[in-house]
Amino acid sequence: MIQIEKMNKVFHLKSGDVTALDNVTLNIGDGMIYGVIGYSGAGKSTLVRCLNLLETPDSGTLSVGDSGVITLKDGKAYDTQGRKMTEKKLGAMRRGIGMIFQHFNLLDRSTVFENIAYPLRYTGMKKADIEARVFELLDLVDLRDKADVYPSQLSGGQKQRVAIARALANKPQVLLSDEATSALDPDATEAILNLLRDLNRKLGLTIVLITHEMAVIKSICQRVAVMENGRVVEEGDVYDIFAHPRAAITRKFVSSASALSKVDKLMEEGSTLVRPTANQKLVRLTFHKDCVGEHVISTVSRDFGVDINIVLANVEVIEDNPLGGMIALLGGEEKQVAAALNYLNENHVYTEVIADGSI
């Protein structure tokens, strides 16, 4: 559905050049909910604007749906025949891509109905057809009773529902969501994510979701790309990224969405709960779906003579698969603890020594 190859974008500012995208390559499957996560300045918002060519990359190629391969060079876009794309062609491509933002960008002096109808005004549709389409969209986002209401009378979650309906007016194949839940409270965020999940299922809609919140990725996405300084530093299935993140920034994001992140605060405070003695190691254990429910902890304690003191533990479900986590103090002779850690790693329990009392 969406293919990006070696995409680059540099902004030339008075203060110097800023590389927003650095050799980005991504493949996003048809009908997928795909997440892109990163901190401010990572390049994720530039990436989403380049997907619909609101911002033209300096180089690379792009293919969205039936657009064919678009070659990007020196800030210009060229079609499969090597011809510079006209505004008409770019407009046709953009109509196949809807977009929602953190700030809803609604017309304050227009009703909900008029806001949703706005993209259809200049398409040549008959008035009756526009009305039918708008009410179809209102039903889709559960706002039919708000058709004649103005944005100022809506909650934040309702405003985002209007923005989603407007983005879907032209029946796009792709919906780009740029921090669409960042301005919402937790309940409204959950409701919008449920709506996006429902639209993905009902319409077969491909959704690219830009966020800085790993909890959002965990809740709705199937795959995720982690961006830092304009580059994709890690990419994969959401479950695999949570189970064994490789890049330092990915580990930080994963930790932020885990109940086990409390260990960091406990360590900062110097709590004795997480302070290993001379013969102990403080270890983070991640239990892959293949071993959740197995008796690995009791086996390690019994067979290797290792004392295990559980400090924190958690099991969550990601993409319908369980993922377990534990912070524990492992005590015993050095060789026994090392053998126990090796056994755990061989049995789909990934281990990370956080602190070592012998050092």
Question: Positions of the model-derived regions?
Answer:
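ABC ATPase "signature
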Residues: 235-236, 244
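A short, surface-exposed alpha-helical micro-motif characterized by mixed small hydrophobic
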Residues: 217-219
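ABC ATPase NBD coupling module
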Residues: 13, 69-98, 122, 127, ...
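Helix-to-loop junction immediately C-terminal to a conserved catalytic motif
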Residues: 52
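The feature captures the beta-strand-to-loop junction immediately N-terminal to the Walker
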Residues: 37-39
